[in-house]
Design a protein with these regions (language model features):
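Single-stranded RNA-binding regions, centering on S1/OB-family and related RNA-binding modules
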Residues: 1-119, 123-237
Length: 237
């Protein structure tokens, strides 16, 4: 009676968890003596009973995804980064430095310290190991300024809109540079603090009303109203 995942391993809907005389618990179902997951979460085995602890707001990494993460730990050969996933991601020093990494000579803290925000790309992930990151591409690396907004990762496609209509409107109307992390973290860089805050308000509105029609027009109207009624403060003051 085999099981196909280790306890506390991440599973997704439709994954075959076990086969044989097991009992289907929370977020699982049984069909033809096989137990499958119905939710994204962590699988648990309690003797003959199998259940999945759902992870509602967590992000499931995919190779190629752009993410915004926070450095959680510094190791001997790199950093552990919180990307809003069930497990921390790994950023190796060799994926940052343009020379061979030498622990005795290279001070990792001088590059990225705990608490630093990073824009990175996922280069490896297969659910049997922690996600691997890189920052060795244009536009990636340490975040030095801007406003970060966190939303439910599954709402990112709504922020983008059909053929990029929503995100392009936001950038145009708020005059902000907006970096969308597929993990639900969004970096906003504007000319003024007010512009960044207006962009953040718009993103929150999209997240809250993502199921409604006519949203692009309503968000556009809100942004224009807010932009027309505030005094702008330079970010350098």
């Amino acid at each position: 009676m085999p099981t196909f995942y280790e306890s506390r391993q991440l599973v997704t809907p439709g994954d075959l968890l076990a086969e044989g005389k097991y009992i289907a618990g929370d977020n699982t179902y049984k069909e033809n003596d096989k137990i499958y997951a119905t939710r994204v979460g962590l699988v648990n085995y309690e003797r003959r009973k199998i259940h999945v602890t759902a992870l509602k707001a967590f992000y499931v990494p995919r190779v190629g995804d752009l993410v915004v993460g926070k450095v959680a730990e510094i190791g001997t050969g790199g950093w552990m980064v919180d990307i809003n996933a069930p497990h921390l991601a790994v950023l190796r020093a060799s994926d940052v430095l343009d020379r061979p990494f030498r622990p005795q000579k290279n001070d990792l803290v001088s590059l990225f310290d705990a608490g630093d925000l990073l824009i990175a790309k996922i280069v490896a992930y297969d659910r049997t190991r922690d996600p691997m990151l890189t920052v060795r591409e244009p536009g990636l690396g340490k975040v030095t300024h801007g406003l970060v907004v966190e939303i439910t990762p599954t709402k990112i496609p709504r922020i983008i809109g059909r053929k990029g209509s929503m995100i392009n409107m936001l950038k145009r109307e708020t005059e902000c540079r907006i970096t969308l992390g597929q993990n639900g973290l969004i970096l906003i860089n504007g000319k003024t603090l007010e512009d960044e805050q207006i962009a953040a308000m718009a993103i929150r509105k999209i997240e809250k009303e993502s199921h409604t029609s006519g949203l692009t027009d309503r968000v556009t109207e809100m942004v224009r109203k807010e932009k027309g009624g505030v005094e702008h403060t330079s970010k350098e003051e």
